[in-house]
């Protein structure tokens, strides 16, 4: 036997569902019967795999002045809060916290310049120096003075320029007291002072 032809149940649109939820919230606020939503509690599985790989663990032990203490059950506990700077330059004695900084510094002594400009072949110790240098080829000047609008290819040049607006002259001659905005100007000035003969 066939079912009598009747109306099909209409599925609500997302907008209609949202309207129903909003009106239910309004009713809860008016009645004051609102309860916090229940969250299902899922038990967590204990972690079986180690948090750090052996290489990472070795790095952590190298980067920290590791100290151990016994907890209340006599088990040694690693305390990684006392940082040290384990990388010392064998040439000049400078100390570095990170191995990468130590490696970069070594290039000062070895003269190694592994980063080259693709356009002119000029070599640099650091990749950031190549980026700055390439602006001389492209003409890019991303650092603009907020006071006068003059643009510079290097942030340090902008900082130097801004002293012209502030009038700051932090470099003072020890012989005569004259002040300069730039250290290079002070050095040039000091060469003009007669040297004392012993």
Swiss-Prot record:
GO terms for cellular component: nucleus. It is found in: Nucleus. Residues 1-55 are annotated as: Disordered. A zinc finger (C2H2-type) spans 87-109, 115-137, 143-165, 171-193. GO terms for molecular function: DNA-binding transcription factor activity, RNA polymerase II-specific; RNA polymerase II transcription regulatory region sequence-specific DNA binding; sequence-specific double-stranded DNA binding; zinc ion binding. The keyword Chaperone does not apply. Residues 13-38 have a biased composition (Basic and acidic residues). Residues 1-12 have a biased composition (Basic residues). The keyword Kinase does not apply. GO terms for biological process: cell differentiation; regulation of transcription by RNA polymerase II; spermatogenesis. Its main location: nucleus. SMART domains: ZnF_C2H2 (SM00355). It holds the Pfam family zf-C2H2. Keywords: Developmental protein, Differentiation, DNA-binding, Metal-binding, Nucleus, Repeat, Spermatogenesis, Transcription, Transcription regulation, Zinc, Zinc-finger. Belongs to the krueppel C2H2-type zinc-finger protein family. A putative DNA-binding regulatory protein associated with meiosis in spermatogenesis. PANTHER family: ZINC FINGER PROTEIN (PTHR24393), ZINC FINGER PROTEIN-RELATED (PTHR24393:SF100). This is Zinc finger protein 41 homolog.
């Amino acid at each position: 036997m066939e079912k009598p032809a009747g109306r099909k149940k209409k599925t609500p649109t997302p907008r209609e569902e949202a309207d129903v939820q909003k009106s239910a919230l309004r009713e809860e606020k008016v009645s004051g019967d609102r309860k916090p939503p229940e969250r299902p509690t899922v038990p967590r599985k204990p972690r079986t795999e180690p948090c750090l790989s052996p290489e990472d663990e070795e790095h952590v032990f190298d980067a920290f002045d590791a100290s151990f203490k016994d907890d209340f059950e006599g088990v040694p506990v690693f305390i990684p809060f006392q940082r040290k700077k384990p990388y010392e330059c064998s040439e000049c004695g400078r100390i570095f916290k990170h191995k990468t900084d130590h490696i970069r510094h070594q290039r000062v002594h070895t003269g190694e310049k592994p980063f080259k400009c693709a356009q002119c072949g000029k070599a640099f110790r650091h990749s950031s120096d190549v980026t700055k240098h390439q602006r001389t080829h492209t003409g890019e000047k991303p650092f603009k003075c907020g006071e006068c609008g003059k643009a510079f290819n290097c942030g340090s040049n902008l900082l130097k320029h801004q002293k012209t607006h502030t009038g700051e002259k932090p470099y003072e001659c020890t012989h005569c007291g004259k002040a300069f905005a730039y250290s290079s100007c002070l050095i040039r000035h000091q060469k003009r002072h007669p040297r004392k003969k012993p």
